[in-house]
């Protein structure tokens, strides 16, 4: 079903916040004086992208440098870093292109600008999809390592991991290309929102199950050492905090953007929804922030990777 306004392109509001042709065409009467619009300065946007770029490049270099990290788990982490890198770079690239065009420093044809916009949109959408896929892949990998520890190396082999990585990248690029081609259909947005909810549900179920298994192990150890109450209390607090941080950051950083897509389908012209649409830049900034946080959660907690990172930094100096 063809989509109504406001949806010419998924990231058009991102462009229109800086151009003179507003995509949403919101008037004061539509949004009301109570509407809260959080403005994200271009400098902050570019700074977040630069931090994400440097951080994720260091993760990729560290994993590539250390042969001890050439395992399925670290391959998934490396691909997550690469996806996060592309998310940040593509969004920042579009921001930079808009600023350059606004300043009149780049004179080019409309068709060329449209082609550049298509390429950047494919990068943005593809990197977002691949980032979500690799977050799910890391959760599955950790689940297998805990519940099938003795068979882990026979289940998660390097060839299978490589095929999974190739499949994720191919699916991400293909889906993003289809999205750009059929951006004006509600089915596209519904597929993206469904994919996000499925990834969130998968991660929640797997990590909660892993937390329950770890709790059982802690209970058994506590009974052996006769320190059951203290160990249980400490483990519950630490495990709950870790799970809350892991899923909480994922939901807070990605949730607003996919809520934005959902509201475009459900209430494209409602005043409350129209007010929400005006904050797309904030939602994109949260996604870039997630690209900064991901290495701290998934990569830098590894002592081996931290040691390699120190070597990389020392060599660069």
Curated annotation (Swiss-Prot):
InterPro entries: GPCR_Rhodpsn, GPCR_Rhodpsn_7TM, Melcrt_ACTH_rcpt, MSH_rcpt. The chain crosses the membrane at residues 38-63, 73-93, 119-140, 164-183, 192-211, 241-266, 280-300. A lipid is attached at residue 315 (S-palmitoyl cysteine). GO terms for cellular component: plasma membrane. Residues 1-37, 94-118, 184-191, 267-279 are extracellular. GO terms for molecular function: melanocyte-stimulating hormone receptor activity. It is a multi-pass membrane protein. Its main location: membrane. SMART domains: 7TM_GPCR_Srsx. The keyword Membrane applies. Belongs to the G-protein coupled receptor 1 family. Interacts with MGRN1, but does not undergo MGRN1-mediated ubiquitination; this interaction competes with GNAS-binding and thus inhibits agonist-induced cAMP production. Interacts with OPN3; the interaction results in a decrease in MC1R-mediated cAMP signaling and ultimately a decrease in melanin production in melanocytes. Receptor for MSH (alpha, beta and gamma) and ACTH. The activity of this receptor is mediated by G proteins which activate adenylate cyclase. Mediates melanogenesis, the production of eumelanin (black/brown) and phaeomelanin (red/yellow), via regulation of cAMP signaling in melanocytes. This is Melanocyte-stimulating hormone receptor. It comes from Chaetodipus baileyi (Bailey's pocket mouse).
């Amino acid at each position: 079903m063809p989509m109504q306004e406001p949806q010419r392109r998924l990231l058009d509001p991102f462009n229109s916040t800086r151009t003179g042709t507003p995509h949403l065409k919101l008037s004061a009467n539509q949004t009301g004086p109570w509407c809260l619009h959080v403005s994200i300065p271009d400098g902050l946007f570019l700074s977040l992208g630069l931090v994400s770029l440097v951080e994720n490049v260091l993760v990729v270099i560290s994993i590539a440098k250390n042969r001890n990290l050439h395992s399925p788990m670290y391959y998934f982490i490396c691909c997550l870093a690469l996806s996060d890198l592309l998310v940040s770079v593509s969004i920042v690239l579009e921001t930079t292109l808009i600023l350059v065009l606004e300043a009149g420093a780049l004179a080019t044809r409309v068709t060329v600008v449209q082609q550049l916009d298509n390429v950047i949109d494919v990068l943005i959408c593809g990197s977002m999809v691949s980032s979500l896929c690799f977050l799910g892949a890391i959760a599955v990998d950790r689940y297998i390592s805990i519940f099938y520890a003795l068979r882990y190396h026979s289940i998660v082999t390097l060839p299978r991991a490589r095929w999974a990585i190739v499949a994720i990248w191919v699916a991400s690029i293909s889906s993003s290309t289809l999205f750009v081609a059929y951006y004006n259909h509600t089915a596209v947005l519904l597929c993206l929102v469904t994919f996000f909810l499925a990834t969130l549900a998968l991660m929640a179920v797997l990590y909660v199950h892993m937390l329950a298994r770890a709790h059982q192990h802690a209970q058994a150890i506590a009974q052996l050492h006769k320190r059951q109450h203290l160990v249980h209390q400490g483990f519950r607090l630490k495990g709950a905090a870790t799970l809350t941080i892991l899923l909480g950051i994922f939901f807070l950083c990605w949730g607003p953007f996919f809520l934005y897509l959902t509201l475009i389908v459900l209430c494209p012209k409602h005043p409350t929804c129209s007010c929400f649409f005006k904050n797309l830049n904030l939602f994109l900034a949260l996604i870039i922030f997630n690209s900064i946080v991901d290495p701290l959660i998934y990569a830098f907690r590894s002592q081996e990777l931290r040691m390699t990172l120190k070597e990389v930094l020392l060599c660069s100096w």
